[in-house]
Amino acid sequence: MIFGHGIDLQEISAVKKAYDRNPRFAKKVLTPKEWERFESLSGERQMSFLAGRWAGKEAFSKAWGTGIGAVGFKDIEILNNDKGAPVVTQSPFEGNVFISISHSGDFVQASVILEKNKR
C-alpha cells in the first residue's frame, strides 16, 4: 500500500551558490558515506551529486508528509547500488522506499514513493 509520494526539483547552480557561500552546507546535507562519494567527485559532478541528494531527501520528506525539519537531512541516506542506481539505505520509514533521481541541464528532479509493508 502506498503511504506517500514526494517530488522535488533543484537547480544545480543554486545549490552551487549555497555551497560557494558556505562549503559546510554539504556536510549538513550529506551523511558520512555520501560525503565520501562527494569527495571522490570533482567540479560540476560534485554539485550535481549534492543537488541530487538534496532533491532526494526533500522528496522523501514530502512523501513522509512532514517536510525537512521533522526528518533531518542526515536521517536519510542515499547511496548507489552496484548498477549505479540511487537507493535509500537509511531512513525513519519502516517499509519500502523507491527513489528515482534525474539530471537534465541545470536541474535535478527526484521522486520518492513510500510503500507500507502488508501485515
UniProtKB/Swiss-Prot annotation:
Transfers the 4'-phosphopantetheine moiety from coenzyme A to a Ser of acyl-carrier-protein. Mg(2+) binds at residues 8, 58. SUPFAM superfamilies: 4'-phosphopantetheinyl transferase. GO terms for cellular component: cytoplasm. It is found in: Cytoplasm. Keywords: Cytoplasm, Fatty acid biosynthesis, Fatty acid metabolism, Lipid biosynthesis, Lipid metabolism, Magnesium, Metal-binding, Transferase. Gene3D superfamilies: 4'-phosphopantetheinyl transferase domain. This is Holo-[acyl-carrier-protein] synthase. Belongs to the P-Pant transferase superfamily. AcpS family. It is an enzyme of class 2 (transferase). Its cofactor is Mg(2+). The gene is acpS. The keyword Flavoprotein does not apply. InterPro entries: 4-PPantetheinyl_Trfase_dom (IPR008278), 4-PPantetheinyl_Trfase_dom_sf (IPR037143), ACPS (IPR002582), Ppantetheine-prot_Trfase_dom (IPR004568).
